[in-house]
Every structure is written in C-alpha cells, then in structure tokens.
C-alpha cells in the first residue's frame, strides 16, 4: 500500500488506463491536486497514444440551432428566449433542410440539430425537420436531439420514449448528442437546471437509444457550482452505461462559459475553472475511461484554440467540429468564434504536432492530411 497517492508512477497510471481505466479514487486524487498534474498529463498522453495513436480527428459539420425559444429556464443558458422577445426565432423544417444542403455543398458530412423546447412545437415538427434534411441532403449524417428534446417529443406525442426514438430513427435520425447531461448531481441540478430532465431520465433515454442502434456522445459541463467529487460521480455513471451498452462514441468535457450565464451574472456561480484544471479534466477522463470510451474531445469553442491544443498533449484526441455557426456558446459569452474552416483546423492540429484526420460522426476516417 502506498503511503501517499503521489507515489503512483506515470507507468502505473498508463498501465491502469490501458487495462480498463484508473479507479475513481485515483481519478479524484488527480483532480484534487493530490497527484503531480504534469505526471497525470504525461500519463494521459501516453495512454492516448497506446489506445488511439497520434492522429487528431475532426468532423466537418454544421450546427443548426433551430429555435432559441424554450419553456425551460436553465440558469446557465444565455441562449434561450421567450416567444415574445424581439430576437426570438424558430426555423421552418424547409429552412432547416436548406441549411443542411448548404452544409453538404460546403463539404460537411454532418449536421448537428438542437434547439430550445418551443411551446408551440409538435412532434410532427421534429419529424419534418428530419424529413427535410434527408430530402435535401440525403447523404448527410443527422446528429440530433438531446435526451431533453427526446423527452419533450414523447410528451408532445403522448408516446413512450422507445416509440418516439423508433419514429425519429425512421425519419432519419442517425445519432444523438449526449448533451443535457450537465452534471448528474441532484443537488447541483436543482440549482443549475431545475426544469431539465433528471439524471435517471437522461440515462434511461440514452440506454434505449443504444438498444435501438442509435449511438450517442456523452458530455459533462463543469466549472460552475460543482466539485471534483461531482465530476468523478458523473464520469462513473457514464462508464457504467458504456460497460453495458458500448453506445458512446466520445466523451466531451464542456468547460462552463460564464460571461453571460444568468447564474454567474447573479453571483451564483464561479467563472469557470483554471486552464490547468481544464487540461486536467481531459487528462483524467482519458485515464479513467481508458479504452472503454476511446475518443476524448476537446471543445475548441469552449476552451479556445490554444488551450484545446494543450489538451491534445494531455489525453484528448479529437477537436470536434468545424461547426459553421454555434449560437449557444456564443450567447453564453464564448469568444472563439462560430466556425473554423477545415484548413484552419488542420493547421491547428499540425501546429500542436499531430497528424490531422477528417472523420465521420462515427469516427470513420475520411481524409488523412
């Protein structure tokens, strides 16, 4: 038995990660600063090289935020509007299809479809958006509708979750973003997003999606009113789901963008975490998930390009999407822009010392640069 957690070596961390992931106690020690952070980051990088190699992937995609009107009032969200706000909007299904076609013509392989919960929406509206996308851009991958939106669709349709997901899949839904997870801690959720679905509901919807052959991502939004213990509990739950279903394609840590978030502006949350903690969260995710969730994404929109490059040397192997509009982070106060050209993201990866690879949503290689 070790006298001190800091006695764990880089090789031990790497071996544990590759063999299935470090235990939660070691992960918590790392996030609480009880382990040398540089040792943790080095181990995460070496584990990443063993698990997925030195390529850094990205997807050419377009975000389509089809409405900013929402019945929920999440206290971190600066994107939502009331129906009578002057800048409230809702796209028609035809407009959504046109944006998908524009994205395809610009070289995108994916559209990411998410929006607020509009009080006048119907389930048919959600189906029609999928129909229009597949009509106007039949080959594009539709990565859409978070578990919160799926729950809302079930309410609108008066159907159970499984039937709704089957209908969405038939209409063209290819995969789902694992957003709306935020932080699973019930105490934090009550303060952060009291209107949002509970963690058990999120897990239930995700598990059914995986059973139906709809792969999803998984996420964690951190740095607001949470703690490292909350982060580990969150990741532990995700690991349990992945052990059962294998349906997660990637884990995306989402650093809290505080500037315009209502909870921060009212003095109820801290302004995110330090850059070092951002990098450590990605490193610990790599070591904790090991080969179980092989892809750890660094969100350049949330972190900024330079910090995202740092995470590539600390466990992350993916930079996400080129985006072509990303309204939610922008409204929250993110300053890194709404899109990158593929050539820009390729250069960012090369500058960090890696081989860029364009991928599909499901991590199939499209082009090695």
Curated annotation (Swiss-Prot):
Coiled-coil ranges per UniProt: none
Catalytic activity reported: 5-amino-6-(D-ribitylamino)uracil + L-tyrosine + S-adenosyl-L-methionine = 5-amino-5-(4-hydroxybenzyl)-6-(D-ribitylimino)-5,6-dihydrouracil + 2-iminoacetate + 5'-deoxyadenosine + L-methionine + H(+)
Binding site for [4Fe-4S] cluster: 70, 74, 77
Functional pathway: Cofactor biosynthesis; coenzyme F0 biosynthesis
InterPro entries linked to this entry: Aldolase_TIM (IPR013785), CofH/MnqC-like_C (IPR045567), CofH_family (IPR019940), Elp3/MiaA/NifB-like_rSAM (IPR006638), F420 (IPR034405), FO_synthase_su2 (IPR020050), rSAM (IPR007197)
UniProt KW keywords: 4Fe-4S, Iron, Iron-sulfur, Metal-binding, S-adenosyl-L-methionine, Transferase
GO molecular function, one term: iron ion binding
Cofactor binding summary note: Binds 1 [4Fe-4S] cluster. The cluster is coordinated with 3 cysteines and an exchangeable S-adenosyl-L-methionine.
Cofactor: [4Fe-4S] cluster
Keyword Hydrolase: no
Record-annotated Radical SAM core domain positions: 56-292
Pfam families, A to Z: CofH_C, Radical_SAM
Top EC category: transferase
EC number(s) on file: 2.5.1.147
Family: Belongs to the radical SAM superfamily. CofH family.
Subunit structure: Consists of two subunits, CofG and CofH.
NCBIfam families in alphabetical order: CofH family radical SAM protein, F420_cofH, PRK07360.1
Function in brief: Catalyzes the radical-mediated synthesis of 5-amino-5-(4-hydroxybenzyl)-6-(D-ribitylimino)-5,6-dihydrouracil from 5-amino-6-(D-ribitylamino)uracil and L-tyrosine.
HAMAP family, sorted: FO_synth_sub2
Designated name of the protein: 5-amino-6-(D-ribitylamino)uracil--L-tyrosine 4-hydroxyphenyl transferase
